[in-house]
Amino acid sequence: MKVRLLSIGKDRSGLYEPAVQEYAKRLGHYTRFELVEMAEASGKRLKPGDAKAAEAEAILSKRKPQDWLVALDERGSLLDSVELSRYVGKAQTGAKDLLFIIGGDEGLDARVRDAANLTLSLSKMTLPHRLARVVLIEQLYRAFTILKGEPYHK
């Protein structure tokens, strides 16, 4: 099984990158993990909503037939860590790869949410997209430790 995180934009501040790298390294002990950073759609000629539409096309073009698509969106389901671990476990037994999507500043286009097998919210609070990466990767690491019965999750 492979876990990919497709995220629009880069962490230009460098603030979150050390945590992303640390949890990605830990996650790598359990599964193949890949972070794919995609460019934000931009330009002076873009109308409101056009960036989301352009990003949606780029995102959906990266989906493979074996992927279970999980879109992160404020309207999504709130899962606790154990529930997320069960979802990851189902993907493992179904021989599916997981593709998590974090949209750009405007969020995700409806086409991405509609294509998703699961729409997931990390919190009722609004999080910066770069911080959402850290939270998600840590929760994925936690999910695998739960599945393995390891003591990280308390």
UniProtKB/Swiss-Prot annotation:
EC class name: transferase
Q: What is its EC number?
A: 2.1.1.177
| Pfam families xrefs | SPOUT_MTase
Superkingdom per UniProt: Bacteria
Gene Ontology CC terms, in alphabetical order? cytoplasm
The record ties this protein, via CDD domains, to: RlmH-like
InterPro entries, sorted = Alpha/beta_knot_MTases, RlmH-like, tRNA_m1G_MTases_N
Q: Is the S-adenosyl-L-methionine keyword given for this protein? A: yes
Which compartment or compartments is the protein found in? Answer: Cytoplasm
Keyword rRNA processing tagged: yes
- Give GO MF terms, alphabetically: rRNA (pseudouridine-N3-)-methyltransferase activity
User: Which reaction is the catalytic activity of this chain?
Assistant: pseudouridine(1915) in 23S rRNA + S-adenosyl-L-methionine = N(3)-methylpseudouridine(1915) in 23S rRNA + S-adenosyl-L-homocysteine + H(+)
UniProt keywords, alphabetically: Cytoplasm, Methyltransferase, rRNA processing, S-adenosyl-L-methionine, Transferase
- The main location is cytoplasm
What positions does the entry give for S-adenosyl-L-methionine binding?
Answer: L72, G103, L122, S123, K124, M125, T126, L127
**HAMAP family membership:** 23SrRNA_methyltr_H (MF_00658)
Q: Which family does it belong to?
A: Belongs to the RNA methyltransferase RlmH family.
Quaternary state and interactors? Homodimer.
Q: Its function?
A: Specifically methylates the pseudouridine at position 1915 (m3Psi1915) in 23S rRNA.
Q: What is this protein called?
A: Ribosomal RNA large subunit methyltransferase H
Q: Which organism is it from?
A: Myxococcus xanthus (strain DK1622)
